Design a protein with these regions (language model features):
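N-terminal Rossmann-fold NAD(P) dinucleotide-binding loop
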Residues: 47
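Conserved redox-cofactor binding core of oxidoreductases
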Residues: 125-215, 227, 271-285
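Conserved N-terminal glycine-rich FAD pyrophosphate-binding loop of Rossmann-like flavoproteins
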Residues: 68-100, 266-270, 279-281
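An anion/pyrophosphate-binding glycine-rich loop and adjacent beta-alpha core
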Residues: 251, 257-400, 474-477
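Glycine-rich Rossmann-fold phosphate-binding loop(s) that bind the pyrophosphate
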Residues: 42-44
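Glycine- and aromatic-enriched mobile tails/lids
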Residues: 20, 25-37, 50-53, 57-59, ...
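Glycine-rich loop(s) and the adjacent beta-strand/alpha-helix scaffold that form part
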Residues: 223-282, 451-474
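Core beta-strand elements of the Rossmann-like FAD/NAD(P) dinucleotide-binding domain
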Residues: 34-36, 214-223, 436
Length: 660
């Protein structure tokens, strides 16, 4: 009999599910909360908001951060904004419209009930952040300003210039700091979770590594929450910070938490192109730029060749010789189509030879028209810090006038190209954000919950704060209300001792390989395999070859890795090696999932399954489910597939259309 997963979606109409859940869930008495401990791993938007909220409720929280400060979490890199259905613009937005756009943007591969709840709590997030003092942009009359993001025909994105993630994180950090000051949160900086401890079938603690001393430390709690972000760095080159890793999630997977839809990896269309083979990360240019920037390539192949050779500049190509291909193909949405659509369109143009830089892997993002229409002052007010960042990296100023012909001003365009950015897949969770391990919860990007096969722009911040501020504080109580869980466990239990010894033995194994290759050299090779075989365009043959190469690179890792130094004290290379071990396993999961899913949907594009127009072609008859993968004893064994059928009550599943 096939294994099944219980998503615990409440009964009743979709608009009433969350309300009914909150009305009937079990609660924990305020006095009893004082007796209960919760571990929260991660201090980004999801982790910081959850830790602060749970502590405010009375729980004792142990919060772990791999950086010197929670303010260095990768959430700080989010630029463009956060979605909410406030409808301040009176342009037709609503909770239902946000819900529908998110499900459609995810190519009908998300759970309806989870997405509706996300849209439902979105407005409360904005109120919470305003109360914290987040300096959202405002219109002349004082109302909060909005702009548009991809996959929407309304303006629902709230923003703080191009620094929205930073400002939201500072708001969450202020709440967290307040609870640290009261003693309700014990914050452990420069600590990394190395394993989850299971006692009587439940998550009851973690083994953490003090990254400064190198020592392993045991922590017990009544529940464990991981908020550790995505796995984009399995591709080596991505927009993720260098420290972003999937070790906590993968360790939970090894202990019995299933992974859901790992092949759903987002390629962001507006990133600064790769500049050389020594590069170690990529830089995101906010999707908000697509509000006022127009994406184009030359109409003539000879112009593209001249751009690639450096004998012609973008501003020298006249308007009539420019192909604004997104506006041409998708007139209803233009440059604001969803990210997967925009990325594939850019790849198609470059594959046809119309790329605009020396590698042929770039397209233009041009602000000439909007600067003339709105004025340079207004454009700089909206995107000034993004223009500065682009100039600092490329030495090109997108706001600088290049030439003027017959009254038409031509500015230096940006060059952009798609890159790995976000992961829609992640640890499987039910409606309560609980994994298949009782007592282990996963929130934010590290779970698979809300975005289906493609996330809409400005929805990552929304999900992280929704989970931390407004969902987990309810659902974790439903679990902790069980009085059998209230006893505090000693970290001297055999389960804790065995987990620590296993981590210690693995560290010793890695240190004693004593091969000839650095962590970075193997990681770079892994990234090349992932991008070439499991990247933007996937095929059956390419994925099969990718799996062979991934098994070979694990062998190379296990036999030829060299880690300098010792395991005692600070050893960044050792930490990176642990991350790389888990990226290899994650890469295999992505490839297995992509190979089994014989369809194209959202960020997962199988070249064998596309329409005549080159759009993603789903197979709803055979693949209308969440693909979940269960660990089988060791890293070498293929994982087992478990299917969670999707159930749609009110949205009609149909082919996505962004053309009209």
């Amino acid at each position: 009999m096939a294994k099944t997963l219980d998503s615990r979606i409440p009964e009743g109409p979709i608009a009433e599910k969350w309300t009914n859940y909150k009305a009937h869930q079990r609660l924990v008495n305020p006095k009893n909360k004082l007796k209960l401990d919760v571990i929260v791993v991660g201090t980004g938007l999801a982790g910081a908001s959850a830790a602060a909220s749970l502590a405010e409720m009375g729980f004792n929280v142990y919060n772990f951060c791999i950086q010197d400060s929670p303010r260095r979490a990768h959430s700080i890199a989010a630029q463009g904004g956060i979605n909410a259905a406030k409808n301040y613009q009176n342009d037709g937005d609503s909770v239902y419209r946000l819900f529908y756009d998110t499900v459609k943007g995810g190519d009908y591969r998300a759970r309806e009930a989870n997405v509706y709840r996300l849209a439902e709590v979105s407005n409360a997030i904005i109120d919470q952040c305003v109360a914290q003092g987040v300096p959202f942009a405002r219109e002349y009359g004082g109302m909060l300003a909005n702009r548009s993001f991809g996959g929407a025909q309304v303006s629902r994105t709230f923003y703080a210039k191009g620094q929205t993630g930073q400002q939201l994180l500072l708001g969450a950090y202020s709440s967290l700091s307040r609870m640290v000051n009261t003693g309700k949160v014990k914050l452990f900086t420069r600590y990394e979770m190395e394993d989850v401890v299971i006692v009587d079938g439940r998550a009851r603690g973690i083994i953490a590594k003090d990254l400064v001393s190198g020592k392993l430390v045991r922590f017990s709690a009544n529940a464990v929450v991981i908020a550790t972000g995505g796995y984009g760095n399995a591709y080596f080159l991505s927009t993720n910070a260098m420290g972003c890793n999937c070790t906590a999630a993968i360790q939970c997977y090894r202990k019995g938490a299933v992974m859901a839809n790992p092949s759903y990896v987002q390629i962001h269309p507006t990133c600064i192109p790769v500049h050389g083979d020594k590069q170690s990360k990529l830089t995101l240019m906010s999707e908000s730029l697509r509000n006022d920037g127009r994406i184009w390539v030359p109409k003539k192949l000879e112009d593209a060749k001249a751009l690639q050779a450096g004998t012609k500049q973008g501003y020298e190509i006249p308007e009539e010789d420019r192909d604004y291909y997104l506006e041409r193909r998708y007139p209803a949405f233009g440059n604001l189509v969803p990210r997967d659509v925009a990325s594939r369109a850019a790849k198609e143009r470059c594959d046809k030879g119309f790329g605009v830089n020396n590698t042929g892997l770039a397209v233009f993002l041009d602000f000439s028209e909007s600067i003339q229409r709105l004025g340079i002052k207004e454009i700089l007010q909206r995107y000034g810090n993004l223009f500065e960042m682009y100039e600092e990296i490329t030495d090109v100023n997108p706001g600088k006038l290049a030439k003027k012909v017959n009254g038409v001003e031509y500015y230096h365009p940006m060059m952009i190209f798609p890159a790995i950015h976000y992961t829609m897949g992640g640890v499987w969770v039910d409606y309560e954000l609980q994994t298949t391990i009782p007592g282990l919860f996963a929130i934010g990007e590290c779970n698979f919950s809300d975005h289906g096969a493609n996330r809409l722009g400005a929805s990552a911040l929304m999900q992280g704060l929704a989970d931390g501020y407004f969902v987990l504080p309810y659902t974790i109580q439903n679990y902790l209300a069980d009085q059998k869980l209230w006893a505090r466990l000693s970290t001297d239990l055999p389960e804790f001792e065995a987990a620590e010894k296993a981590v210690e033995a693995e560290i010793d194994r890695l240190m004693n390989i004593k091969g000839k290759r650095s962590v970075d050299s193997i990681h770079k090779e892994l990234g090349h395999i992932m991008w070439e075989h499991v990247g933007m365009g996937r095929t059956k043959e390419g994925l099969q070859e990718g799996l062979k190469l991934l098994k070979a690179i694990r062998k190379e890792f296990n036999e030829n890795l060299f880690i300098p130094g010792t395991k005692e004290g600070l050893n960044i290379e050792l930490d990176k090696a642990i991350h790389l071990r888990d990226f290899i396993l994650m890469g295999e999961l992505i490839a297995y999932d992509a190979l089994h899913r014989e369809e194209s949907c959202g960020g997962h594009f199988r070249e064998e399954h596309q329409t005549e127009e080159g759009e993603a072609k789903r197979d709803d008859e055979n693949f209308f489910y969440v693909g979940c993968w269960e660990y089988q004893n060791n890293d070498e064994s293929a994982p087992e597939l478990i299917k969670e059928p999707l159930q749609y009550e009110i949205i009609k599943v149909q082919q996505r259309n962004y053309k009209n």
